[in-house]
Amino acid sequence: MDEVVYIPPQTKEEIECCMINLENFININTSDFCDLDPLIKLAIIHHQFESIHPFYDGNGRTGRILCVLYLVTNDLIDLPILYLSRYITHNKSKYYDLIQCIRDNEGNNEKDWQNWILFMLKGLEQTSKETVLLIQNIKIPWMSTRLKFGKNLEQSIAMNF
């Protein structure tokens, strides 16, 4: 039998209070709040959402999409194309261990937060590089095909869609 390592807020009132607190934190203008870098704030937001665990299912997916939406909303990326899912999946046990370390110390250990934030920053960096490479691998053949077929390709695409 698996050991329960964390019990998230249980009652509707607890969850609602935590979500309101998180929503307020997300919407506070960072420059008004303190000198908190938006990427560090993103790591804190993600941890807090995962700890609130407001849904029966889908918290992980929702937490990851929340990261992407935060990046877009804060003009850190133009389009919602940066997904941390692969990074988190490949580093799943470290991801959960780091989240749990913060919970175990009730968020009071600065080193736990530092390790978590560095993990998330590394994930953002790695995912960004992979995304740029993927776009380049799509763009180069597309441009080559476009040059080869020119307007005929554009007309064919327009007629088929």
Across the structure, where does each feature detected by a protein language model lie?
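FIC/Doc superfamily catalytic core
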Residues: M1-F161
